[in-house]
Amino acid sequence: MSSLTSLTLKGALDGLEKGDFTSVELTRAHIDAIEAARGLNAFLLETPEQALSMAAASDARRALDAARPLDGIPLGIKDLFCTQGVRTTAASKILEPFVPQYESTVTSQLWRDGAVMLGKLNLDEFAMGSSNETSAYGPVVNPWRKAGSNQALTPGGSSGGSAAAVAADLCLGATATDTGGSIRQPAAFTGTVGIKPTYGRCSRWGVVAFASSLDQAGPIAKTVTDAALLLTSMSGHDPKDSTSLDVPVPDFSAFVGKSIKGLRIGVPQEYRVDGMPAEIEKLWADGIAWLKDAGCEIVEISLPHTKYALPAYYIVAPAEASSNLARYDGMRYGLRAEGSNLTEVYENTRAEGFGDEVKRRILIGTYVLSAGYYDAYYLKALKVRRRIAEDFDNAWERCDAILTPTAPSAAFGLGENSSDPIAMYLNDVFTVTTNLAGLPGLSLPAGLDANGLPLGLQIIGKPLDEGTVFSVAGVLEKAAGFTAKATKWW
């Protein structure tokens, strides 16, 4: 059955439609693959019985000619999405015993469309991290390795479990979230496709909050078409989320394969950062050449406030996190530590329940929101955020989409940057601007570095113009011809 796990999501839908195999067979093949790949630590919780039950229900619908858009497709769910009756931890000790009594909007829409849940995927604790090393349940290991090396590499973060599971053929797609690059950077590190849609395109209801004005759900998948199919199901207005946009959801997969002749593609000069590896420079140049060949006009643009994006992000995001994470006090749900009085219970619960990176961000956030520093830090960061959004507004007068690298390097070794938070934060240098401006951004694999590791290109689009992003991505995917897979060692 291993051939079933190597299918794309679209290929699996076609096979199910033709009757080449059943959803139960497809799901069983993925359950077996997950069991054999526990060394990757991609799944925090496996739900094989529930998966097979959902698959059987899917087969029954298909037999009645009542198949839904994703009927029978086995998916992994990032353990930040609440799943009714299934433990949801956000990869934190403080939520270890938490079983939600409700389903997140995004996952309920996937189940509505017939998808199958294989289990919950590992991540950085509360989605805070760029390497999946902050998880209370251990790091995820990237299925990719450097040529001739056994060194364990990071899959990126925070959606490291989602990216690793898709790259290792453990699921046909996965849900993920992106606050500063947490879909796109792991996709780049694992040779997968990931899209963060426009802020408000997918509901945040039932997704454990990190930074509410930046968080956005999206899919990680094997191909651009697969990502488009998943995003179509995940998107839509939700009255339970006050930031959800009440706009129509197109069939995003219809945009893949469209001609992009005449499109203006912006290339921001500020993204040519010092110390960027020559391989990433070359990949970017290749991407520009491929789009020129497709009939695009390449336009040099300026996003002058880019250099302030990371500092602004690492003020705004921790500030919102310190507020959001105040709810974890041991009273209503999650871990409760012992103490001789109420204050001690609060203090001990949070001290025992949160990991170091989460504590670091709560402290930073509390500091920048404090009376003496609010104006100097938080208010100033909000002004910078507005300037960054204005930079993009000005750029859209000259271009229709923007092409950049996704990350400043290929996957690095586990433990390599964990002692230096600043070095870790620099992984987000190309991705945080789209979160600050609320724009759609997609990463797709476009080449390998000298060590045989995947490298990604990022396409940034206008607000709610995921369609153009998918059209450009489809052309780049075809031109790059990226078919490499991680050599199985697990």
Curated annotation (Swiss-Prot):
Any single Gene Ontology cellular-component annotation: glutamyl-tRNA(Gln) amidotransferase complex
Q: Does the keyword Kinase apply?
A: no
- Please name the catalytic residues of this protein: 78 (charge relay system), 158 (charge relay system), 182 (acyl-ester intermediate)
Q: Which GO terms describe its biological process?
A: translation
Q: Which GO terms describe its molecular function?
A: ATP binding; glutaminyl-tRNA synthase (glutamine-hydrolyzing) activity
E.C. code? 6.3.5.7
- Keywords, alphabetical: ATP-binding, Ligase, Nucleotide-binding, Protein biosynthesis
Q: Name one Pfam family in it.
A: Amidase
Q: Does the keyword ATP-binding apply?
A: yes
Q: Reaction catalysed?
A: L-glutamyl-tRNA(Gln) + L-glutamine + ATP + H2O = L-glutaminyl-tRNA(Gln) + L-glutamate + ADP + phosphate + H(+)
Q: Which family does it belong to?
A: Belongs to the amidase family. GatA subfamily.
Q: How does it assemble?
A: Heterotrimer of A, B and C subunits.
**Stated role:** Allows the formation of correctly charged Gln-tRNA(Gln) through the transamidation of misacylated Glu-tRNA(Gln) in organisms which lack glutaminyl-tRNA synthetase. The reaction takes place in the presence of glutamine and ATP through an activated gamma-phospho-Glu-tRNA(Gln).
- Please identify the protein, giving its name as recorded: Glutamyl-tRNA(Gln) amidotransferase subunit A
Instruction: Tell me which species this is from.
Output: Caulobacter sp. (strain K31)
The gene for this chain is gatA
